[in-house]
Amino acid sequence: MRDRVKALLVVILALQSAGICGQFIPKDYSHKEMKAAKNWVDSTYNHLSMDERLGQLFIIALYTNKGEEHIEEVRKVVKNEKIGGLILMQDDARREIELLNEFQSEAKVRLLVGMDAEWGLFQRIKTAYKLPWAITLGAIQDKRLLYEMSAQIAADAKKVGVHWDFAPVVDVNTNPKNPIIGNRSFGSDVGNVSQSALHYSKGLQEQNILAAIKHFPGHGDTDVDSHLDLPLVSHSTKRLNEVELAPFKALINKGIGGVMVAHLYVPALEKRVGIPASVSYDIVTRLLKKKLGYKGLIITDALNMGAVAKRYKAGELDAMAFKAGNDIMLFSQGVAEGKRLIRKAIEAGEIPQKRLEESVKKILLTKYYLGLNKEYTPLSAENIDRELSSPAHKALAQKLYSAALTLIKNDEHLLPLRKNETYYYLPLEEAPHQTFADELAKENTIVVIKNEKEIAGIPRNSKLIVGLHKDNSTAYKPYKISDKSKARLLNLAEHHQIILNVFGSPYALKDIDITPISTVLVSYENNDDSMVATAQSMQGKQPINGRIPVLVNDTITYGMGMSLD
């Protein structure tokens, strides 16, 4: 046994000395497999031309909803530029599988295929099943459930040919006005974000799907969407180390395969004015690679985003990102020009030849670990839509929403609901609500209030369930409650026993005085599964154990919540 461990260490050290030690290693990998990986990487690298080596650094986007002209353009880039991978965007699963079968069968080195699937493949494939957002997961106390969810995402990813889920988000969301992170963050507490992300990442990687923690060095306290322009993170180095960088530092030695670098301007880390983190040598190489010691794949955020695309030319941007220390340029808009400029910089001695070898061998090693060294077996698209949206997905989603449900107040002990009592139900705000009413009505007498006249007819001191149903059709919809709904809620609280359900972000309560409200629940999202899970928990069929994952205001703080069995 001792000799076997010693031999394995020798191989690992050999990989490190060759500059190809990625952070991700499949579970229970043997000495023999590690040695085979090194041999394959060396052999493959040596058989690639300079142009093919450069191609491995690039991932471009594939949309199946943009028509054949776009697909033909992707086909040309894949064939002519010998790129390293694809990111799947808004996709039809069947067409996407057909195209991957074509591209993978023809590739000299198989493509590394990624996707943003933070809440499952639904994020890109609308026939897939929607699983909860990170803010919902952050409320769950049993983090093993997050592993269960990401393991399901991994199983789904394999069915459509995806090897890399660009998730989880480890940004600490300390800014309620953040327009792009918000629901995508596990919350405002460093420890909770780190633990949630670790379980999520393990669920992916233990099924051999790569994870990527993002958005380094921390996108949580911004009020600009980097898809549109360059956000500023103006905190001191001390604050950055304590908050923004803390989850990355906690996770960097946990074997996570990728780190995605954001398009952010962080003056405390980059002294040159207006330079995004993604093209900053100080941030990518000096901080992430050298100071923090990260050895896995480093990938840029999408290079078509306004934060960088408005500032730099396509191709030039790719070369800058590579010089900064990134291994992979994601969503490249100028592969041929990027390759030309990187090659020119290598020939001029601006970038060491060894640097290219390091990145390409890291990419190849990851491909080997993910099984991309093997001959491609075409995927089947038959029944794919049904497989991505099954009864098992529904059961998992409802279990997760039930575990996240958070009871902030229950002053009059109105929960659980009593079967022999009548409850009035008033839906407020813009989103659907009927599923919630229908589920409640299975066990209770529910009178749905539909207009002003019916509100006036509610007997005084009635038990009134008020649902704040926010539009959750995307993760980026506003969470704020209208002044009209807030005024109506507080007026009703003067005359009735209120059970308030927030089917949306807990930040919706930021400007609401909950003092006169008897009972307050947060369900985090407004969809059929969250409504069913909430109704069943209110009826006592499931326990309530969630905790608020963000600091909302002085009254509603991180970790707030009570259990109800």
What are these regions (language model features)?
Residues 1-27:
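Bacterial Sec-dependent N-terminal signal peptides
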Residues 49, 70, 86, 94-111, ...:
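Second-shell residues forming the walls of enzyme active-site clefts
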Residues 73-89, 151-164:
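Catalytic domains of carbohydrate-active enzymes, especially glycoside hydrolases
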